[in-house]
Each structure stands twice: as structure tokens, then as C-alpha cells.
Curated annotation (Swiss-Prot):
Belongs to the ABC transporter superfamily. Lipoprotein translocase (TC 3.A.1.125) family. This is Lipoprotein-releasing system ATP-binding protein LolD 2. The gene is lolD2. The lineage of its organism: Bacteria, Pseudomonadati, Chlorobiota, Chlorobiia, Chlorobiales. Its EC number is 7.6.2.-. It is an enzyme of class 7 (translocase).
Length: 241
């Protein structure tokens, strides 16, 4: 059964610059993503990709449109349906974030970086470390648990960042140019890892990238241009559920 995880309808966003000139960043963007689906969004710099991720992740506020997450309305009638505190709690439980720059804490080991979110939420350090170790081992980092970020390769650092994003078992992961600083081999491995996670854990991924080759590894690919979103390529994989 296909379960819709995220349903965003007619999202628009504009900014007013100095001199009161208004720039329309997003214009009536509609996107529906299903459970366990990997979706990529390609487009030139400044096309609105990152702004869209920020709206979908409730990090910014749309001018108009609706956002429904797992059948729960989050944004409608030009406002969020939850208080700021409740929205932050919802975001921390349901959404994971991966960025081009991993933002790992330099004085903490890979294990500690991943375990921290759950430890802060539950206060149970031992359980958090067990869960973090399981994730990192699943990502091929069992021998890197006690290494600092500076002791890891770029590909390993991004795998740690993805493990951290998955620590709270989110329903959706938003990734903004996650392979931007990686070489071709590590980029390929990273996308293969995200594709595997999406199917094994039924976690939806929305990935912004400028690389069309990696984008084609997704279940669906969209193209963003001048604030408008259109489907670039749609096909079924033999591995799709």
C-alpha cells in the first residue's frame, strides 16, 4: 500500500530586498512524497531548491500553500497549525537533516556525535550509544566509532551525518547537496546508501543536488527552474516496493 508521507500543495515564497524590490523564490510548488521513496530535485543555483527544503522542513514559513505531513496538517490558512515549541518538537522527532557541510562537533567522536540527539531527548546515554553504534556499524563504520571527525575521510564524515539524521527514526530526511564536497566514488556510495535506507527503513528522502547522474538514482526526479517545480524523470526501479 502506498502511504503519502508528505503532501505540499501550491507553496509560494518571496523575499523583499532593500529598496522594496520583491523576488519570487517559489511559485505554486506542489510535491507529494510517499513512505520509503527517494526523491531528488535538480536545478541551477538560485532556482529555489534550498528554499523549498527549508519550507518542507518547517525551517521557514511559506507565503501561501499547504503542508500535510503523514496526514497531519502542518501549514494551512497562511500559518502553522502548531505552536513554535510544538513545531520544533515535531521537527526533531519526524524529520532528519543532512547538509553539504556535515557540521559534526570537532571535539566529539563519531559515536558521540550520533548519540547526542537521543541522549538530549531521553537522558539515557547508554541506550543512545547502543543505538548510535548500531547505525554506524550498518554504515560500515564499526572501526571508526571512537574517531574524531578530523580523523575521518569526507565520505565517512557524511555517513556519520546521515546516521545522526536517522538517530530519532525520522519519517523524512531532507538532504541539501549531501555529496557536494565528495569525489565521484564517495558520492556514488553515498547515494547508494541513501537509496538502501529508504527501502529498508521505509524512510522518505528528498535530496537536492546539481548532479543529474546521481539524481537519476532516485525513484523520482524533479527539476526546479525559476521557482517552478516539474517532474524531470519518472520510472520504476526493480528494487521498488
Amino acid at each position: 500500500m502506498i502511504i503519502t508521507m508528505l503532501d505540499a500543495q501550491q507553496l509560494s515564497k518571496s523575499y523583499t530586498l532593500a529598496g522594496k524590490r520583491t523576488i519570487n523564490i517559489l511559485q505554486g510548488v506542489t510535491l507529494r512524497v510517499h513512505e520509503g521513496e527517494m526523491v531528488t530535485i535538480v536545478g541551477a543555483s538560485g532556482s529555489g531548491k534550498t528554499t523549498l527544503l527549508n519550507l518542507l522542513g518547517t525551517l521557514d514559513t511559506p507565503d501561501s500553500g499547504t503542508i500535510v505531513f503523514n496526514n497531519q496538517p502542518l501549514f494551512q490558512n497562511n500559518r502553522y497549525t502548531l505552536s513554535r515549541k510544538a513545531l520544533a518538537a515535531f521537527r526533531n522527532r519526524q524529520i532528519g537533516f543532512v547538509f553539504q557541510f556535515h557540521h559534526l562537533l570537532s571535539d566529539f567522536t563519531a559515536l558521540e556525535n550520533v548519540a547526542m540527539a537521543e541522549f538530549i531527548a531521553t537522558g539515557n546515554l547508554q541506550a543512545a550509544k547502543v543505538r548510535a553504534a548500531e547505525l554506524l556499524t550498518n554504515f560500515g563504520l564499526s572501526e571508526r566509532l571512537d574517531h574524531l571527525p578530523s580523523e575521518l575521510s569526507g565520505g565517512e564524515q557524511q555517513r556519520v551525518a546521515i546516521a545522526r539524521a536517522l538517530m530519532n527514526n525520522p519519517k523524512l530526511v531532507l538532504a541539501d547537496e549531501p555529496s557536494g564536497n565528495l569525489d565521484q566514488r564517495n558520492s556514488q556510495l553515498l547515494y547508494e546508501l541513501m537509496a538502501r535506507i529508504s527501502k529498508e527503513q521505509r524512510t522518505a528522502f528528498i535530496i537536492v543536488t546539481h548532479n543529474y547522474d546521481y539524481a537519476a538514482m532516485a525513484d523520482r526526479c524533479f527539476c526546479m527552474e525559476n521557482g517552478l517545480l516539474g517532474e524531470y524523470k519518472s520510472y520504476e526501479k526493480s528494487t521498488a516496493v
